Regions:
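Helix C-cap/helix->beta junction micro-motif
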Residues: 105, 164-165, 279
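A short helix-loop-beta submotif of the ANL/AMP-binding
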Residues: 103-109
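Active-site phosphate-binding strand-loop segment of PLP-dependent enzymes
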Residues: 114-181
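N-terminal small-domain helix-loop-helix segment of the aminotransferase-like
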Residues: 1-69, 76, 250-253, 266, ...
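Conserved PLP-anchoring active-site segment centered on the Schiff-base-forming lysine
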Residues: 80-102
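Short acidic capping loops at alpha-helix termini that bridge into adjacent secondary structure
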Residues: 58-64, 84-87, 133, 195-198
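PLP-dependent aminotransferase class I/II
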Residues: 16, 197-283
């Protein structure tokens, strides 16, 4: 009873009121039906604006798909791009779902140990891991579970390797708003030529404290999205409409609440960092 678990990525904040209120409003109006398989148009438009903040351009009509959380997004993408016998590079340690979802596709997992380099993958490591059977690499920056960000200069080198070998890059960016000490998130999809190879995966669980709302999204090229859409359409149909309305309002007007939570997380992180150092633990 005296042990505090830090093992689950679950914000201890309630979803900001502005988001809950928006969802309540639409439920009270009786808007409780299916949405388009793509997701609400207003949400996709807000997502496109959001991605533009990170120097990425995606059409809300054909290159952005709303999903039931990022976990569904990962599953749908892997089943769209992988064939039995393919290889996928997974940077470890990693989010617990990556490997099982890849294994369900009957592919070979190539494990990349990032602990040898400060818990982020390097371009040279990735280059060495690529074979003629490599179909994709799974990146997560900031990392779950380590929190480590891939430095922008290294990320640019990784982009070069990906373009050279023409493999897919699944970029899980669900923690991108929770960065500290003045750092800014950089998406691998923002580098020249990377839109053709990058599949951006993101959602609202972490930044907006919306884990139970199950709302995420995929952004990628139109050609690939046409295939991912089919899997989504016939498996989950759409994310809950009230979650979509809430997420759209979060993107429009919820950023001050996100910042309050981020500041609190940074204060907690600093406290843990100080305590670990005082105990002589490596940080």
């Amino acid at each position: 009873d005296d042990i505090i678990s830090l093992g689950v990525g679950e914000p201890d904040f309630s979803t900001p009121w502005i988001i809950r209120e928006e969802a309540f409003y639409h439920m009270e109006k009786g808007q409780t039906s299916y949405t388009s398989n793509w997701g609400l148009a207003e949400l996709r438009e807000e997502i496109a604006k959001y991605l533009a903040r990170y120097n990425m351009s995606y059409s809300p009509k054909s290159e952005i798909l709303v999903t039931v959380g990022v976990s569904e997004a990962v599953d749908a993408v892997l089943r769209s791009i992988l064939n039995p016998g393919d290889e996928i590079i997974v940077c470890e340690p990693c989010y617990v779902s990556y490997q099982p979802l890849a294994q369900l596709c009957d592919v070979k997992l190539v494990h990349l140990d990032t602990s040898v380099n400060g818990f982020y993958p390097t371009a040279s490591q990735i280059e060495d891991a690529i074979t003629e059977k490599t179909k994709a690499i799974m990146l997560c920056s900031p990392s779950n579970p380590t929190g480590r960000m891939i430095p922008a200069d290294e990320l640019e080198k990784i982009a070069g390797v990906i373009k050279k070998h023409q493999i897919w890059c699944l970029s899980d960016e669900v923690y991108c708003e929770l960065v500290y000490d003045g750092h800014k998130h950089v998406s691998i999809g923002s580098f020249p030529g990377m839109k053709d190879y990058t599949i951006v995966l993101n959602g609202f669980s972490k930044a907006f404290a919306m884990t139970g709302w199950r709302i995420g999204f995929i952004a990628c090229s139109e050609e690939l999205m046409a295939q991912i859409y089919k899997l989504h359409q016939y498996s989950t149909i759409c994310a809950p409409i009230m979650s979509q309305f809430g997420a759209a309002e979060g993107l429009r007007n919820g950023w001050s609440e996100v910042e309050k939570m981020r500041v609190s997380y940074q204060q907690r992180r600093n406290l843990m960092y100080k305590a670990f150092n005082e105990m002589g633990l490596p940080t």
